[in-house]
Amino acid sequence: MATTHLDVCAVVPAAGFGRRMQTECPKQYLSIGNQTILEHSVYALLAHPRVKRVVIAISPGDSRFAQLPLANHPQITVVDGGDERADSVLAGLKAAGDAQWVLVHDAARPCLHQDDLARLLALSETSRTGGILAAPVRDTMKRAEPGKNAIAHTVDRNGLWHALTPQFFPRELLHDCLTRALNEGAAITDEASALEYCGFHPQLVEGRADNIKVTRPEDLALAEFYLTRTIHQENT
């Protein structure tokens, strides 16, 4: 199928293990309902008609993915991921074909809402650099004293945002920025930070705070609650 300027490829780095979950099974393969977290995350992307393909970067020794129904989906491409997130994203970008824009989404972020995704994708019509889903910080923020669990001072939360995913950029721009940042030893914690390092200023698209990443054991029950609530709302 030929791609158009509106078609989008998504990249899902899924080669990590997530030791904070305290389980032997990588967190993306834990189940919520009758699907794994990874499947929830990927199907949320494929639910939008502009997302024509999802490239999933998995660990070379991963034996779990092939057992999922997702492995046989015609819109899924699988590549070997790397040791770091940025390496996996770059591997995914190389398999993204001629898509002009790419989404990058966390494998363990299963609660993405379609209205948030649609507003993020609309950036391709108005922006040359793209942007990210993000949620304004609402809690009081404290800076700790170096090496201590003691408060140094309160941080002004005005203008602070929690970075979420998906993150959405022109494919070539993201590839070039990630490559440069890695080659120059920059600290890259998400895709937007690579663009920031290269002098770009991606936009912030406010998204729902319940678009959580499953990182700790208690997050699993919370994600299950959010997903169950969403399914109930869609069916009423």
Curated annotation (Swiss-Prot):
One of its GO terms (molecular function) is 2-C-methyl-D-erythritol 4-phosphate cytidylyltransferase activity. Pathway: Isoprenoid biosynthesis; isopentenyl diphosphate biosynthesis via DXP pathway; isopentenyl diphosphate from 1-deoxy-D-xylulose 5-phosphate: step 2/6. Keywords: Isoprene biosynthesis, Nucleotidyltransferase, Transferase. It catalyses: 2-C-methyl-D-erythritol 4-phosphate + CTP + H(+) = 4-CDP-2-C-methyl-D-erythritol + diphosphate. It comes from the Bacteria. Its EC number is 2.7.7.60. InterPro entries: IspD (IPR001228), IspD/TarI (IPR034683), IspD/TarI_cytidylyltransf_bact (IPR050088), ISPD_synthase_CS (IPR018294), Nucleotide-diphossugar_trans (IPR029044). The record marks 20, 27 as: Transition state stabilizer. GO terms for biological process: isopentenyl diphosphate biosynthetic process, methylerythritol 4-phosphate pathway. PROSITE patterns: ISPD. The record marks 157, 213 as: Positions MEP for the nucleophilic attack. SUPFAM superfamilies: Nucleotide-diphospho-sugar transferases. The keyword Transmembrane does not apply. Belongs to the IspD/TarI cytidylyltransferase family. IspD subfamily. PANTHER family: 2-C-METHYL-D-ERYTHRITOL 4-PHOSPHATE CYTIDYLYLTRANSFERASE, CHLOROPLASTIC (PTHR32125:SF4). Catalyzes the formation of 4-diphosphocytidyl-2-C-methyl-D-erythritol from CTP and 2-C-methyl-D-erythritol 4-phosphate (MEP). Homodimer. NCBIfam families: ispD (TIGR00453). This is 2-C-methyl-D-erythritol 4-phosphate cytidylyltransferase. It comes from Escherichia coli O157:H7.
